Each structure stands twice: as structure tokens, then as C-alpha cells.
């Protein structure tokens, strides 16, 4: 019981996201009535009580906690008690299932924009499943101290594998139903076939956090440990027997595997005692003086990680009585509205004084500027907004106007673009009524672009604009937030460009740098350059097309030696910083010219004389009577602004 209550997955979630632990702790109590020799409706009723106690805290975790009981019922072919139990579960859960179904019809499709099945299942191999380190979060972040140590430290790898080995041994002495449950659990957690993963990103998206099904593995394994320990006595003298020695070793394993709990490592990073008083003062002021408008919490942050503690959710959330908005990792609003928030963030970052004009569309008349984020912020930021500034410690409150519902006296201006375009147009030309359309627009913008988005970060989340056949580097089903606007994308001419990687990739370490994409190598501007992604020290870039006796023009951003390849022929070339060099490509006519780097550097110029290869962001022609074009690089700073339209 102790090993189950303090299993690795529990230690990984407790105190950080305890809602995922609560239903799991009740799973054994659901099973218990179904272990009687003869099952009746009373057993089904008894098994329903712990399901009722799981509450509505996490629907998927509730289903997962009931799955071990379902396995036992199916194994025993106890269909009548099983049906009675299912009806009981539905009855005690109807109070939250009903609203969940109704709200699900109106909720934005946020599961498309969070962790994908490729992320949640990446570390679910057999050893990790048996050890119990099934939660994916500790593998990508050190925030959950206990979970991170259990997942990565060799000591815990050994002791958790030791417990798993004891459990497998003991399991061989138990009834077969427990072995069946273990096999089912391994199959559910460890299946890596494509159709299964695709289903977890599609109709089964609610179940993609498979670690919630850990009880299918943990219950039978720990029953096996209990069975093994029952026949392993502890030493009673200084000369223990073999069994007593094994018993002592097993006890030590049990103590060691739960050591994160008794060594005070349960709390995650950023634990805090209370929210500072200045947050209470600031929110009280807003509740009094900005009650008839919406408040923007600025700047954006994936999660609320302050210098005084990591609340994860916004510290103002339980304190504000007024409408408020923030750009965080998972805004629970429609995708177009998220794009609109991104446009507001870009406008405020570019020029706060004019960017505030984009707030009126969202009904925002007050801004909370926080200076206590872990990343650090400009203390003078609030003064750049204009408006009436009130200071409360590390939080500034700016009262702009009491913006509410906006009414336009004329028909809206039709805009071909994404939600972000509305905010940018407001910032530059002033707010007015505008409508997003996909054709016959009065204003044509270069948004949205075909891009990859790393939904897991707000620090350089968007790649450079891409061509239709460029590979995606993100695992989500949707490359970016969908939009009503026509898609601007890179069109290639004279051939194509392929690269080993790019610092402009959405998944590049440290965030995407759109000015370092493959397009930058062939844009005719020496101020921009393609760079391989950080960590790609042997990168390459390749021109593909039909080249006759090609002469290559090449320029690097630093002194380096590159290898120019064409088929089986190759030549090494020494380059000086920002000095163009012409090279006769070995091998004659070719369909591919590759430049291999000897170390990570930028390629500012790459082209074949008289046979240019181009990549240009092209705005689709959907509006023959357009009155105005609006192009920008605030959302994706590509270094230069080149558009074909």
C-alpha cells in the first residue's frame, strides 16, 4: 500500500498537479469488491462508492482509475455485475458528465494545441513502464523535483527496476488475472504503432496522457511485491539466512524507492508560502477602478513563474472580480482569438505607445504590467504605454479608458488575413470595425503564413514562413492555429532548397529565429543568412534543380571551410567572412549541389550563376478590388521584408 501511494508516477504529480493523483488513489478500492468469490449487485454498489468519491477533478483519470476493475470483470466474465457497476458509475457521475458534454460542444479545440501523442508516449518504453516513470513531464522539465530525479538519476533507475523485478517474481505466484492486467497495462502504455498514436491525436485525444493508466501496471506489480515479501522474513540475528538477506534487501529497496517523499523532495521548484501583498493591492485597485472594462495581464508568459514563486496559473486569477485576458501557453479561446492576442503582443512589443490602440477591439481598458516574472522585465515598461500609471510594488496598473463593446457606424472593412492582422492594423491606423474574410477584401495582409508553431513555448514559437512541401518539425496534427484568412506561403522558382536543419525551425533550441531560414540564403540580401539549428555542427544546405555546368556563388558569415558536392564529386573551399566566392561545381551538369559545413556558421549567399533558385513569400491573389496592402515582419522577424503579390 505504501509503495502504491508513493509510486513514481504519484511522486511525479503530487503537489504539482495533484488532480491526476486523486482518482488513482481510489483505484484499489474500486477493485476490492470484485475480488469476492461470488459477485452480486451489492459488490457492484460497493465498487461504485469510490468512483463517486473521485469527483469531477479529471475525467480521463477517473476512466483510467476504473480500468483495472473493468479488466477483472471481463476476465471473470462477470457481465451482469459489470453492467450494474457501469450503470452505477454513470449515475454517480452524471452531475459532471452532462455539463462536460454540453460544454464540449462550445469549447475551443485546445487539445490540438497542447502536447501531442508523440510527446506523451516518447518515453513509454518497457523499462520506464515497469519502473513507473510513465509521466512525460519530468523528462522535459526539472520543475517536478521528485519526478525528475526518479526519471534521470541512476540510483533511482536501479531501485525502481529492483522493485519491478521483485514484483514480476511475486506476480508469478498470484492468480493469472493479475498477469493479464499487467499485460493489458503494458499494451495500453507501450503501444507505438502509427494508427494508435494517430488516434490519440484524433478521436482519442482526451486519453493521450497515457500515464494516467499506470494503475494497470502498478497494482499487479506491487501485489507481486507483497506476495514476494510475504515469504521473505527479515533477519533476526547477525547471521541471516539467504531468505532473510533477500528480505532485508527488499525492505531497503522499498525504503529507497520512496525516499523522495521522506527526504522532503515532494515540492516542485518555485514553491511559495503566499502571494505577495502587492498583488492583492493591485487587484483590489482594479476591482474598484476598472470594474466596467477588461484588464490585460502583461507581458505574456507560458506559465506564471515569478521570482517569489511559481504559481503556474496567474496569481491574479482568484483575486480579480473583473474580466481579464492574458497570453499564456494554453489560452482557452478559439484559435483566431489566440492569433489576435499574438497580434496585440507583437504590437505592444514593437511600440507600446501605439500598440495600446489594439486593445480597444478586445474591450481592454486597463493593463497590469508585472515585473516579478522569473525572466525579468523592464521596470520602465509601464511608462511607455501612456495612460494613468499606479504602482503597487512589482506590479503597475495602467488605466487607459473604459473600453467596452465597440459599435461601428459603417459596414466593416473587409480584411484578408488572420486574427493577428486586426491588432496590427489597429495599432498602425487606429481602431475601427474590420471583418476577416478569405476573398474580396478591401485590405490584403500577408497573414496568416504557412508556418510551424511550437505550442509549448512563447519564446520564439513560430518558424519562418514555409513552402507547401517543406517538412514539418512539429508533432501536432495542426502546424499552426487555423485561421479564416488565405494562407501566404513560400513559392520556389528555378529549383528548391533543402537543409539539414534551420535555426528558424519552430523546434530549434532556444526558440525559432526566422531570419536564419533557408530562404535567407537565396533572398539576395547579404544581411541575412541561413544557419543550421543549434547542435547541428555538421549541417548542410543543398540546391536542387537542373543545373548546366554550374558556377556556384557562395558567402559565409565567418571564416570556414566547406565542401561543395555534386554526386560523387567534391571540392573543399576556404571562405572568408562576408566575401562572395565563385566556385566551379565539380562533376558538370547536375540536379543537386550540396554545401557541407565543417562547423556551425551562416550561409549568407548561395546561388548558381544565371540559374537562380528563389524562395519568396507569396501573398495569394484573392481580392481583385483590393484598396490597400499591409505587409509586416513583427510576428516573424525575417530580417528583410520581401513579398510577391
Give, region by region, the residue ranges found by the protein language model.
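Membrane-embedded helix bundles of polyisoprenyl
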Residues: 1-75, 82-100, 250-261, 295
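Extracytoplasmic
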Residues: 245-327, 421, 428-436
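A short beta-strand element within beta-rich, extracytoplasmic domains
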Residues: 525, 541, 546-559, 595
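Extracytoplasmic/lumenal acceptor-recognition loop(s) of multi-pass membrane glycoenzymes
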Residues: 290-358, 447-526, 629-644
Amino acid at each position: 500500500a505504501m509503495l502504491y501511494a508513493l509510486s513514481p508516477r504519484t511522486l511525479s504529480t503530487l503537489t504539482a498537479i495533484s488532480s491526476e493523483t486523486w482518482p488513482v488513489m481510489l483505484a484499489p478500492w474500486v477493485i476490492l469488491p470484485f475480488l469476492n468469490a461470488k459477485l452480486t449487485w451489492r459488490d457492484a454498489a460497493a465498487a461504485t462508492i469510490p468512483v463517486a468519491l473521485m469527483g469531477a477533478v479529471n475525467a480521463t483519470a477517473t476512466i483510467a482509475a476504473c480500468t483495472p476493475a473493468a479488466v477483472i470483470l471481463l476476465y471473470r466474465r462477470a457481465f451482469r455485475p459489470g453492467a450494474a457497476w457501469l450503470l452505477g458509475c454513470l449515475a454517480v457521475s452524471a452531475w459532471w458528465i452532462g455539463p462536460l458534454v454540453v460544454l464540449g460542444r462550445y469549447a475551443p479545440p485546445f487539445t490540438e494545441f497542447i502536447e501531442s501523442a508523440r510527446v506523451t508516449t516518447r518515453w513509454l518504453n518497457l523499462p520506464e513502464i515497469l519502473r513507473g516513470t510513465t509521466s512525460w513531464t519530468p523528462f522535459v522539465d526539472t520543475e517536478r523535483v521528485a519526478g525528475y530525479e526518479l526519471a534521470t538519476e541512476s540510483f533511482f533507475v536501479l531501485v525502481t527496476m529492483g522493485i519491478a523485478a521483485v514484483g514480476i517474481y511475486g506476480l508469478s505466484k498470484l492468480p493469472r488475472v493479475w498477469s493479464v492486467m499487467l499485460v493489458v497495462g503494458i499494451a495500453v502504455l507501450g503501444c507505438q504503432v502509427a494508427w494508435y498514436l494517430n488516434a490519440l491525436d484524433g478521436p482519442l485525444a482526451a486519453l493521450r496522457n497515457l500515464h494516467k493508466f499506470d494503475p494497470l501496471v502498478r497494482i499487479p506489480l506491487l501485489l507481486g511485491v507483497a506476495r514476494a515479501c510475504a515469504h521473505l522474513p527479515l533477519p533476526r540475528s547477525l547471521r541471516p539466512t539467504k531468505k532473510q538477506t533477500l528480505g532485508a534487501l527488499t525492505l531497503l529497496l522499498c525504503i529507497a524507492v520512496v525516499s523522495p517523499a521522506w527526504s522532503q523532495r515532494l515540492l516542485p521548484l518555485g514553491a511559495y508560502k503566499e502571494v505577495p501583498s502587492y498583488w492583492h493591492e493591485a487587484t483590489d485597485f482594479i476591482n474598484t477602478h476598472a470594474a466596467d472594462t477588461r484588464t490585460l495581464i502583461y507581458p505574456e508568459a507560458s506559465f506564471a513563474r515569478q521570482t517569489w514563486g511559481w504559481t503556474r496559473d496567474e496569481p491574479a486569477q482568484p483575486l480579480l472580480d473583473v474580466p481579464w485576458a492574458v497570453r499564456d501557453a494554453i489560452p482557452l479561446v478559439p484559435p483566431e482569438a489566440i492569433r489576435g492576442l499574438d497580434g496585440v503582443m507583437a504590437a505592444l512589443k514593437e511600440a507600446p505607445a501605439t500598440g495600446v490602440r489594439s486593445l480597444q477591439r478586445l474591450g481592454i481598458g486597463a493593463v497590469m504590467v508585472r515585473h516579478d516574472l522569473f525572466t525579468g522585465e523592464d521596470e520602465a515598461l509601464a511608462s511607455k504605454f501612456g495612460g494613468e500609471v499606479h504602482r503597487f510594488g512589482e506590479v503597475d496598473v495602467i488605466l487607459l479608458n473604459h473600453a467596452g463593446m465597440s459599435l461601428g457606424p459603417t459596414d466593416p472593412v473587409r480584411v484578408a488575413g488572420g486574427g493577428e492582422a486586426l491588432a496590427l492594423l489597429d495599432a498602425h491606423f487606429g481602431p475601427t470595425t474590420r471583418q476577416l474574410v478569405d476573398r474580396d477584401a478591401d485590405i490584403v495582409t500577408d497573414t496568416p503564413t504557412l508556418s510551424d508553431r511550437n505550442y509549448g513555448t512563447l519564446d520564439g514559437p513560430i518558424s519562418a514562413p514555409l513552402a507547401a512541401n517543406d517538412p514539418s518539425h512539429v508533432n501536432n496534427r495542426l502546424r499552426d492555429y487555423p485561421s479564416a484568412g488565405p494562407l501566404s506561403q513560400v513559392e520556389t522558382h528555378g529549383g528548391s532548397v533543402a537543409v539539414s536543419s534551420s535555426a528558424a525551425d519552430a523546434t530549434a533550441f532556444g526558440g525559432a529565429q526566422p531570419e536564419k531560414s533557408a530562404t535567407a540564403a537565396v533572398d539576395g540580401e547579404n544581411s541575412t543568412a541561413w544557419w543550421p539549428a543549434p547542435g547541428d555542427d555538421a549541417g548542410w544546405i543543398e540546391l536542387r534543380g537542373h543545373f548546366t555546368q554550374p558556377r556556384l556563388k557562395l558567402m559565409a558569415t565567418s571564416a570556414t571551410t566547406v565542401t561543395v558536392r555534386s554526386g560523387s564529386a567534391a571540392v573543399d573551399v576556404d571562405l572568408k567572412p562576408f566575401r562572395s566566392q565563385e566556385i566551379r561545381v565539380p562533376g558538370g551538369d547536375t540536379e543537386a549541389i550540396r554545401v557541407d559545413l565543417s562547423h556551425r556558421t551562416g550561409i549568407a549567399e548561395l546561388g548558381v550563376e544565371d540559374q537562380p533558385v528563389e524562395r519568396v513569400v507569396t501573398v495569394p491573389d484573392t481580392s481583385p478590388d483590393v484598396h490597400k496592402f499591409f505587409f509586416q515582419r513583427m510576428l516573424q522577424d525575417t530580417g528583410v521584408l520581401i513579398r510577391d503579390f
